[in-house]
């Protein structure tokens, strides 16, 4: 798949097999088959943030609706900004950093301070693709130093007088308000951000958006009628929040050691991403598709495929409880081969 006009998280990834493997159906389960309470506790809701409340307030409402102890959103939106606010629940909040650092897409209404030739507007916008320099706004939670951020693509959707509607895919931490200001300067007419909506955040898109009202209704249906179906629709397994990361698939016998904080050795791997780079953040999965941990790759794909020993990855955040899988069982007759 071409990477033009796409976020890094949208580039297709493929797995390569290192060795055959078996998984025991007695231990663990596919993420979508978790009991409902565990499903909620290890879930993520792709909330459609309305204009008005802060991102923190929206996350707090999600927490209150579902009765979970913790809820964390993946990247703040200003109060007036709408759109995607993926909110991880309970134990899934450990995966927030992986999603927060992923690329984002926005649709923006730029208001120029005077009308400019449409052809020139399109040309100048295109010149902002690639690395750009930005200084965080005065009212910012981060230190005000010049930073480099990557603009993956800009597509002008509509121009009417002084109004410009454009779609932009960018690196996490890009200030779209500052981008609008800089485009206005480059055009020589000035400009400012009039309105903004986030349309993609890592692997999440508008197709799976859920309103707070829909979330509340789904929870009530389950509590009052015992119907889990709508709740399972609006809440997605936490695994969907890291689907953009390179994957390493573990043997069942290696899972518990990683859950206890041990590094992942090469013999514990059955398959992995075809383009894993040393030092890259990777997601460790079971053969059933369960997220075990986020880890730093200590070898690249080629090195892992050639090696028979050594440390392949070091866990950074463990999301699966120790004891979910037994320690080093080998009874293949009780297993399902994959």
UniProtKB/Swiss-Prot annotation:
GO MF annotations in UniProt: pseudouridine synthase activity; RNA binding; tRNA pseudouridine(55) synthase activity
SUPFAM superfamilies in UniProt: Pseudouridine synthase, PUA domain-like
Enzyme class: isomerase
Catalytic activity: uridine(55) in tRNA = pseudouridine(55) in tRNA
Keyword tRNA processing among UniProt keywords: yes
Enzyme Commission identifier(s): 5.4.99.25
PUA domain residues: 245-320
Name of one Pfam family that matches: DKCLD
Residues at the catalytic site: 78
A GO BP annotation: snRNA pseudouridine synthesis
UniProt entry tagged with the keyword Isomerase: yes
Keywords: Isomerase, tRNA processing
Taxonomy, superkingdom: Archaea
Family: Belongs to the pseudouridine synthase TruB family. Type 2 subfamily.
Function: Could be responsible for synthesis of pseudouridine from uracil-55 in the psi GC loop of transfer RNAs.
Protein name: Probable tRNA pseudouridine synthase B
């Amino acid at each position: 798949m071409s990477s033009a006009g796409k976020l890094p998280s949208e580039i297709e990834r493929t797995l390569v097999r290192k060795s055959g493997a078996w998984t025991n159906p007695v231990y663990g389960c596919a993420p979508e088959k978790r009991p409902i309470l565990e499903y909620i506790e290890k879930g993520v809701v792709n909330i459609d943030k309305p204009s008005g409340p802060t991102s923190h307030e929206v996350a707090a409402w999600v927490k209150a609706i579902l009765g979970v102890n913790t809820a964390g959103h993946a990247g703040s939106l200003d109060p007036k900004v709408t759109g995607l606010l993926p909110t991880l629940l309970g134990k899934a909040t450990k995966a927030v950093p992986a999603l927060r650092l992923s690329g984002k897409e926005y649709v923006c209404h730029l208001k120029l301070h005077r009308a400019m030739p449409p052809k020139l507007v399109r040309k100048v916008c295109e010149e902002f693709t690639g690395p750009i320099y930005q200084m965080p706004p005065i009212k910012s939670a981060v230190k005000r130093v010049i930073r480099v951020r990557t603009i993956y693509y800009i597509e002008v959707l509509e121009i009417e007088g002084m109004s410009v509607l454009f779609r932009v895919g960018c690196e996490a931490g890009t200030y779209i308000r500052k981008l609008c200001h800089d485009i206005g300067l480059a055009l020589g007419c000035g400009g400012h951000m009039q309105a903004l909506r986030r349309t993609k955040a890592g692997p999440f898109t508008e197709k799976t958006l859920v309103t707070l009202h829909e979330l509340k209704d789904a929870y009530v249906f389950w509590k009052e009628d015992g119907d889990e179906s709508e709740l399972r629709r609006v809440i997605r397994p936490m695994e969907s929040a890291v689907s953009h990361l390179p994957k390493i698939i573990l043997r069942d016998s290696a899972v518990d050691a990683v859950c206890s904080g041990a590094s992942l050795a090469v013999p514990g791997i059955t398959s992995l991403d075809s383009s894993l780079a040393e030092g890259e953040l990777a997601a460790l999965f079971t053969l059933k598709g369960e997220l075990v941990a986020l880890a730093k790759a200590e070898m690249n794909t080629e090195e892992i495929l050639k090696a028979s020993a050594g440390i392949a990855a070091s866990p950074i955040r463990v999301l699966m409880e120790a004891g979910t899988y037994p320690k080093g069982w080998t009874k293949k007759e009780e297993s399902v081969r994959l």
